[in-house]
Amino acid sequence: MKNNLLSEKLIYTGDSLTPTHLHLCTYNATEMQESSGDTFQSVKETLDNERINWLQVHGLKDTETIREICSHFEIDFLVLQDILNANHPTKIEEHDKYIVLILKIFYPNEHKEDDDLDGLLQQQVCIILGNNYVLTFLEKETDFFDEINAALRNDILKIRSRLTDYLLSVLLNSIMANYISTISSIDDALEDLEEELLMITNENDIGIQILSLIHI
């Protein structure tokens, strides 16, 4: 594996072919404006330093667009490389003007076969929290944060009156809910597997041995 600290290249290391698409929500306590596009220039004019700006990036294929975004918000080049590294370990990193979080979210594999054990897929999400902005980078087009978009449009619980740290907490709450749901689905699958193993009556069978070890 090459040392990225010595490289000036920007390479997305994941396997998603999703074209890069941007969605910007700019808001304050009284109003909200949205814009979407495939380039940073197409949404840049909507940015407002007097408001909260939440820029959602879906698809990391266009590394030059990712570079433009990070350059505008003065994000360090090494952080930019981390965003594009789909296999980056989970981390929270504090910088002078912003905080970086790299996490994973999980979702069902809709194309798996009945005997396929790989029932869960994952994708990386990177969140950058600044003074008046939040940036979220996802590998694929997804509705994962749609509930938060709807809450902003309808100003649920006066969410638009809050600062960026509150938006971050809402984003993290959605991710934590995803973890809980994922763990629950794994527990259900393990219970189903245990029931199948209990139907085996041969005491010498490997299934019985596994169960005995589980319940020691």
Residue positions per predicted region:
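Peripheral, non-transmembrane regulatory/ligand-interaction domains of membrane transport proteins
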Residues: M1-I214
